[in-house]
């Protein structure tokens, strides 16, 4: 990208932008919620559209001069509906958290009971964590994974639903590596008369590519981010049945947001177009293939995977048998150029700021071009770095650098 203006006007920020690019170019990105946006997406984010205020919706704005950005938002909405087979799409949420908040405000009253996945078992902050608005405003009851299989036990979910009679059940996760059965969640909701919301932020790309069952036919509302496996800008998205569209839209604007970010909505439209291309399905298939292979290579080196494997773009690694915490593993691997994040594991005994595991994803490295054959080397570097953590790590830094040089970023 051309940074001639910022390099001249604000060299301090320009220097940090260049430093971050260098970090990304020379590092292996394994954070499951990150990806590498295309230059087309980034150009949209940096476009003239950032200048336009557009409170409201296409054809019903509170400002003049919106006839151009109306077209942008209409394209984004139509592409989102086509991509996921949805009746209605709202592309205005600034984030996934705000998308979830908008759904809650559409169908819940303060204090209503909601059933969501426990954060320590793979859920998200907005699925009822007591430190989050969701846990403060609503009465969340949590379900988790089975102690033995480390997968969702739908019989237990049903029992909790019958016992607590939630008005809403939230399906979806931020650290769950297995296929989620949305049909079973729908059946449970129908049995007790509850709404179903699916947070597919992590798996949206897989759903778009047909590599994970779609929640759209089963859920009343589906929320997502656009920057994880969808490989777009940082932002949110909501899909819903047409009968909820009017109430949902007014809970986003004027309910909880003012002006939409039109440059980001344009970038969302670009990413939806990219995801509609047949090549995106091939990309997502490689993401899953790489993730499965990386998991298998780690298992060969004595690592334990939560639920013993993966069906998607991420693996959760239990480090209890490696005599290292998630926090220390994250810091250690960062030193050699591998970024991932500490993560709680089922039956966690440590603080969420320390943890007993790490979460690993392959979306970003696959975008960059990493292939299945590279997963063995990545697993080997991770393993040897942890084993030799008290020794000189320079040779592992060089191995990371050598891998990265094979797959240049933004060149």
UniProtKB/Swiss-Prot annotation:
Catalytic activity: (6R)-5,10-methylene-5,6,7,8-tetrahydrofolate + glycine + H2O = (6S)-5,6,7,8-tetrahydrofolate + L-serine
Site location (Plays an important role in substrate specificity): 227
Keyword field contains Glycoprotein: no
Keyword Transferase tagged: yes
N6-(pyridoxal phosphate)lysine modification, residue list: 228
UniProt main location, coarse: cytoplasm
Cofactor: pyridoxal 5'-phosphate
Single Gene Ontology BP annotation: glycine biosynthetic process from serine
UniProt EC number: 2.1.2.1
The protein's annotated pathway: One-carbon metabolism; tetrahydrofolate interconversion; Amino-acid biosynthesis; glycine biosynthesis; glycine from L-serine: step 1/1
Stored Pfam families: SHMT (PF00464)
Residues annotated for (6S)-5,6,7,8-tetrahydrofolate binding in this entry: 119, 123-125, 351-353
HAMAP family attached to this UniProt entry: SHMT (MF_00051)
Known role: Catalyzes the reversible interconversion of serine and glycine with tetrahydrofolate (THF) serving as the one-carbon carrier. This reaction serves as the major source of one-carbon groups required for the biosynthesis of purines, thymidylate, methionine, and other important biomolecules. Also exhibits THF-independent aldolase activity toward beta-hydroxyamino acids, producing glycine and aldehydes, via a retro-aldol mechanism.
Descriptive protein name: Serine hydroxymethyltransferase
Organism field: Clostridium botulinum (strain Alaska E43 / Type E3)
């Amino acid at each position: 990208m051309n940074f001639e203006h910022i390099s001249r006007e604000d060299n301090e920020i320009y220097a940090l932008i260049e430093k971050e690019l260098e970090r990304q170019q020379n590092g292996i990105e394994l954070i499951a919620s990150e990806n590498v946006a295309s230059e087309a997406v980034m150009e949209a984010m940096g476009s003239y559209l950032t200048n336009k205020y557009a409170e409201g919706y296409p054809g019903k704005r509170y400002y003049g001069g919106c006839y151009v950005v109306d077209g942008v938002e209409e394209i984004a909405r139509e592409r989102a509906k086509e991509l996921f087979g949805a009746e209605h799409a709202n592309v205005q949420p600034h984030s996934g958290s705000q998308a979830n908040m908008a759904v809650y405000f559409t169908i819940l009253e303060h204090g209503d009971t909601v059933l969501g996945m426990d954060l320590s078992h793979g859920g998200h902050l907005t699925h009822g964590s007591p430190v989050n608005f969701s846990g403060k405003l609503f009465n969340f009851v949590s379900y988790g994974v089975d102690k033995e299989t480390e997968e969702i036990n739908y019989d237990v979910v049903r029992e909790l639903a019958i016992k607590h009679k939630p008005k809403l059940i939230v399906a979806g996760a931020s650290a769950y590596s297995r296929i989620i059965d949305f049909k079973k969640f729908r059946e449970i909701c129908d049995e007790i008369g509850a709404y179903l919301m699916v947070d597919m932020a992590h798996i949206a790309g897989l759903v778009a590519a047909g590599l994970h069952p779609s929640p759209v036919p089963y859920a009343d509302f589906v929320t997502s981010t656009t920057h994880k496996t969808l490989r777009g800008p940082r932002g949110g998205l909501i899909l819903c049945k047409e009968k909820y569209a009017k109430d949902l839209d007014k809970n986003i604007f004027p309910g909880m947001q003012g002006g939409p970010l039109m440059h980001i909505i344009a970038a969302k439209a670009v990413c939806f177009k990219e995801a509609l291309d047949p090549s995106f399905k091939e990309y997502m298939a490689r993401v899953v293939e790489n993730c499965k292979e990386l998991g298998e290579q780690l298992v060969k080196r004595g690592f334990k995977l939560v639920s013993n494997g993966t069906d998607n773009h991420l693996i959760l690694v239990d480090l209890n048998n490696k005599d290292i915490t998630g926090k220390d593993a994250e810091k250690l691997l960062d030193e050699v150029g591998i970024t991932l994040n500490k993560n709680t594991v089922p039956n966690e005994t440590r603080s969420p700021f320390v943890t007993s595991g790490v979460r690993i994803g392959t979306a970003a490295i696959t975008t960059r071009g990493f292939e299945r054959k590279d997963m063995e080397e990545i697993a080997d570097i991770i393993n040897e770095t942890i084993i030799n953590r008290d020794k000189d790590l320079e040779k592992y830094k060089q191995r990371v650098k050598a891998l990265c040089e094979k797959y240049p970023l933004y060149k």
